[in-house]
From Swiss-Prot:
Presence of the UniProt keyword Transferase in the record: yes
Subunit structure, as described in the record: Monomer.
Protein name per the record: O-acyltransferase ausP
Keyword Ion transport: no
Keyword annotations: Acyltransferase, Transferase
EC assignment: 2.3.1.-
PANTHER family the record matches: FAMILY REGULATORY PROTEIN, PUTATIVE (AFU_ORTHOLOGUE AFUA_3G14730)-RELATED
Length: 482
């Protein structure tokens, strides 16, 4: 009911703070984090909603995990500031619960439902699969009207963790919703892992949770000066920033759409073997990961379909986790990612083989994941802004976020299965339903690897380029690469 009350009351009336609420100051965040993260998971088993809710309640009474039930509040009345707090109730009650959980009972089969049936499912593991998911995303994310931005959460008294369960005769869809100011994908993955530990009766496996008031970047220290940051002289500002914004507006004029691509394990292994063979002619012990190859291969496919001027600069940003720098005994849920930048002329990327871009992506990650570079980046960002824009005024910006470390594909809810379940009960489909809003650059999400080691990706690109991408994928499927 709190969801309904939020959208029917006077928006200018701010919610009262509970007299015994504990106030937790969230680290400052850039404006791009003020959106929601909304993810739909399909399970091919009926799940017991009571077991799922009881295990959630149990988790959110353990130590700092309770902070996930806090209410978002704006710390600064300045509307341009991105400073928020969590007001954590001393006790979670029916009126102020630790989380919101909506249940929709549907009597039919999951594949008979007009929306659920359109979520991407594994098909031929030997072919690159292509899914148009526009019709599947909208109905899932609009069934309940949650706040969409951090300020809307601050105007409500809703708990930031929200779940919607669509229960069918033979399956379940769970929509996970949370404000991005709280966590990144890896942090949410740590939360889900703790949840399943409680669900399985293994409370002793739940790690200590780091409080949200502790900034992971501050934990790393600031011993390295800002000038040591690799890209410190590539800040986009002034007229160059205006030119880039105008160009981005122009490129968004036709609108953008999402597609999901499933890439066979053997294709990536074959491509990686070829990349390593190419690199071995100039390097003694070359290394690139499967995700390096995946991003490099598909970025070249995207560039070929977009047909940008070859003199433009491709700026490929690749999100990486900084938790490897922190003590391992605690779970760090808060946003803890930085962006590795690869800047190359478009023509150079298209002229050279996949190995060229894959190697540059790996070099960027190796260079920017060091403790010194992360410290320098944080010091530099404090000088020029929390998340400054790097690149050139004519750049083609492409952002990539790798959710594979969040392990969404491994979320095992077998202990909540209504009927006896042999083996794990993991998602058969994952769909990002988040709404970025406004003008956005091109971006892709690596959703993870499934049980057949096939990679799943979801990309947000201009509508006009998808036909060319689909033709290229069809061509690839005609080639014998096993």
């Amino acid at each position: 009911m709190e969801v309904v009350r939020y959208f029917t009351r006077n928006q200018k009336q701010l919610p009262a703070t509970g007299p015994n609420d504990s106030i937790v100051q969230l680290p400052d965040i850039p404006p791009c984090y003020e959106c929601n993260v909304e993810v739909a998971l399909r399970f091919d088993s009926s799940l017991d909603s009571e077991k799922l809710q009881q295990s959630l309640k149990q988790l959110l009474e353990i130590g700092n995990w309770r902070q996930l039930g806090g209410r978002v509040r704006r710390r600064d009345t300045n509307p341009s500031a991105c400073n928020y707090d969590l007001h954590v109730p001393a006790e979670f009650t029916t009126e102020r619960p630790a989380f919101n959980y909506q249940i929709w009972e549907l009597s039919g089969a999951i594949d008979e439902h007009p929306t659920a049936s359109k979520m991407p499912r594994p098909t031929d593991p030997k072919k690159v699969s292509f899914y148009n998911v526009g019709d599947a995303r909208s109905p899932l994310r609009t069934r309940t009207r949650y706040p969409r931005k951090a300020q809307e959460w601050a105007d409500s008294d809703l708990p930031p963790l929200s779940f919607e369960q669509l229960s069918f005769r033979d399956g379940t869809i769970i929509l996970l919703v949370f404000p991005h100011i709280l966590m990144d994908a890896t942090g949410y993955g740590l939360f889900l892992k703790a949840w399943t530990s409680v669900l399985q009766g293994r409370i002793d496996h739940v790690p200590q949770c780091c409080g949200f008031s502790e900034s992971t970047t501050d934990m790393l220290g600031h011993k390295t000066p800002a000038g040591a940051f690799t890209w410190h002289n590539h800040l986009l500002k002034g007229l160059d920033s205006l030119k880039f914004t105008a160009g981005l507006l122009w490129e968004n004029r036709w609108g953008k759409e999402d597609r999901v691509i499933r890439v066979p394990a053997k294709f990536i292994m074959h491509t990686r073997d070829k990349v390593l063979a190419d690199l071995s002619t100039s390097q003694p012990s070359p290394f690139v990961s499967q995700s390096d190859v995946l991003i490099a291969w598909f970025t070249r496919v995207v560039l070929a379909a977009l047909k940008p001027l070859q003199r433009r600069t491709l700026v490929l940003t690749n999100a990486f986790d900084t938790r490897h720098m922190l003590p391992p005994e605690r779970a760090y849920l808060q946003n803890s990612v930085c962006m590795a930048h690869t800047m190359l002329p478009v023509g150079e990327v298209l002229y050279n083989p996949v190995s060229f871009l894959a190697n540059e992506i790996r070099r960027s990650l190796v260079r920017e994941r060091t403790e010194e570079q992360i410290q320098a980046r944080c010091a530099w960002a404090k000088d020029v802004g929390i998340m400054p824009l790097l690149g050139t005024s004519d750049m083609l910006l492409c952002n990539v976020s790798n959710w594979s470390k969040g392990n969404l594909v491994d979320l095992d809810l077998c202990h909540a299965a209504v009927t006896e379940h042999r083996g794990p009960c993991v998602p058969s489909s994952i769909l990002n339903c988040s709404q970025m809003g406004g003008v956005t650059p091109n971006y892709g999400i690596i959703l993870g690897k499934d049980s057949q080691d096939c990679w799943w990706m979801q990309w947000h690109l201009p509508k006009f380029c998808w036909a060319g991408i689909e033709r290229e994928l069809d061509t690839i499927n005609q080639i014998r690469w096993e």
